[in-house]
Amino acid sequence: IDQTYHSFAVGEQVIVMQMQDDVIGTNTSNNTNFGRLSNIQSAGAFDISTITSVNSTTIVLNAPLQNNYNINSQSRVQVTSFRKLSTGDYTTTGNITALAWNGNVGGIVAIQVPGILTLAHSITADGKGFRGGAVSANYESTCQPSVYISSSTNFGGKGEGIFRNTNNSYATGRARILNGGGGGNDDNAGGGGGGNFTTGGLGGHGWTCETNPSGGLGGIELKAYSNGMRLFMGGGGGGGQQNNGYSTPGGAGGGIIIIQANVIKTNCSGNVKISANGINPVNTGGNGNDGAGGGGAGGTIVIQANNFNVPASCPLQVSANGGNGGNVNHTGAHGGGGGGAQGAVVYSVSLPATNITTNTLNGIGGFNSIGGARAGSASGVDNEGIMTGINIVLPVNLISFTAKKDGFTSVLSWTSTDDNSIDYYIEHSTDGIHFNTIAITKGSGKKKYSYTHRTPATGKNYYRLKMILRTSGLSSFSPVAYITNENTSMPLAVFPNPSSGNFMLRVQDKGQEFTVIITDLMGKPVYTNSYRAVNNAIEVHTGNGLKPGTYIIQVANKNYKQTGRVIIN
């Protein structure tokens, strides 16, 4: 567990996300199909869960993950903190910036505030996503449009994307590698733009390669999977090809930002922003007569807030724009970088407009020469990556959940910021692993809830809440709470047993009032009544209400509990 930048703690919510997966399939030949998507697998899938224990090698979560995650040499799964900044309102004290993705960790900012999140500063993940491709070595030959994959450094490096490449034979060449842009080929072609919601732009053709264009292909679009159930970082742009030492590497893609709050407001003297933009590569240097890098694609921003309060004095800019391709600073036509694709911005409500500007813009292709034609821009229509009315993070902040022993009953209490669309499934377990639903409480906006479990088992009783959003079926779990019931008595004596439905129970306390609960073997109550013990015995009359079979009997009051079985014939 890498805790260099953050120490995980018990009770902390975390996000488990499949950053990369083995999605390339058989698209590995040296042709234009290299690097296309075969099967999305689990790429972009994520879960939100809570830590119940942690040490230097292991994190234990409070519930099984709902998605499947793949761990192999072509994949990466990351666990990152979904940090709760406060138990109420919170005002930023400085800019919040994502850690740059390094191939294992980084690229994500995820914060939650139960009340009002006041932005006095910006939250950014610009260029913190998938990394851009490297420039080639100094090399010159004729135009080489048919080299799609290679291990040679004579060609520009491919940008990074949702497939983790460990094969050096795929490292360079003009083919994209999923949403990572392809590298520029000889002679002096530009790198392709990274992809995300749309496709990255084609790198510029290269020196004297107008009829044999050798620019990097743009990274693929992931629009079909950007439905709120998967989140993607922007693909890196491909690197430029050079023979004079003036090329530039591809731009990195934007990272992922997740913000959950009841209200988002701003308070500043200028403006603030929430941005996950792709990077614009620098223009070719020196004499400029080499290929430029492709732009990084925009990342993904998720804003789950019920209301916004943004005054004109402090407007908010939200953007997941693709980076523009690098320009060639030379009068002769070489290869500008392809434009990076737009990313995605996901709101849980309709698009907020008052003093808020939201953009997902496609990156523009860089100039192939000073004042000349441009390389390819990213495809699609600007701002089509803006999505509204999508709840992907459960819109409930569970402030507390406790279990307390009250005699032989368990009293569960919880407090949340409830929006009336949550169902609380109360789950019980005797081993902390296998849970069963014992009750359902519908959220009513009252924020404070309780439930009494009247038939807990002897020994440890574990409880948790499964919180389900009615509109989408999305769910998350509370931390696990438990109580312990001591076994202070012998098993309950029942006679006659088997019985026709009328029988006696031997108890230890005479003259006391008891509750008798009879359940089936699945734990469903089928009979409940109150009795007073006479001479340490209770006479139970169920009539003809019980079908033949085996039942569990519990006799309890505030200070006493016994459990036994009865067979009805």
Each language-model region and where it sits:
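Surface-exposed, proline-anchored Ser/Thr-rich loop/turn motifs
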Residues: 396-416, 478-509, 519-525, 547-548, ...
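Small/polar beta-strand repeat architecture
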Residues: 24-94
